[in-house]
Amino acid sequence: MKELFMKEALIRAKIAFERDEVPIGAVVVKNNEIIGFGQNRTIEKNSVFAHAEIEAINMASKKEQNYRLIGCDIYSTIEPCHLCAKAIVASRIDNLYIGAREPKEGSIVSQDNFLDKLFHNHKTHYEIGILESECKEIIQSFFKAKR
């Protein structure tokens, strides 16, 4: 099931790629059903907050009519930044599944261990490496084309 949901997140990343946004996608899952999805839309929305994970969390919160997404998991093609990691914790998401590490901005294991901090009022568990090569490939090809 993890691969299936990460494939859905990759679809969102491909949409971002086609729109010339950084190709990161995310889906929020509850009871094996996608209740929220998103891709980076920072350029489209002129908003630093329009990251894939936050877009997916916002959609799921609207559907659930609750910002607390207890019993939910989130799948992100790339390791979340601090902004998204805080949103994941604040929304009480149970599990974070990551496609590939982000060596420059990743706040889960690459640049920080944000989810392991003791000051959080909620513990989100994480796993890295779901469809890692596919997730790496899309973001690397995007930035290669930009250079």
Predicted features and spans:
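Zinc-dependent deaminase
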Residues: 1-19, 67, 80-147
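Helix-adjacent hinge/juxtasegments
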Residues: 49-50, 54, 58-87
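Short, basic and Ser/Thr-rich N-terminal targeting/leader segments
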Residues: 20-24, 70
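Short beta-strand scaffold segments in enzyme catalytic cores
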Residues: 24-32
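Conserved Nudix-box catalytic region and its N-terminal flanking loop in Nudix hydrolases
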Residues: 44-47
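Residues that line or immediately flank small-molecule/substrate-binding pockets and catalytic motifs
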Residues: 42, 76, 100
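Short beta->alpha transition motifs characteristic of CBS
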Residues: 35-42, 125
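Small-residue (primarily alanine) positions within well-ordered alpha-helices
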Residues: 9, 13-16, 26, 52, ...
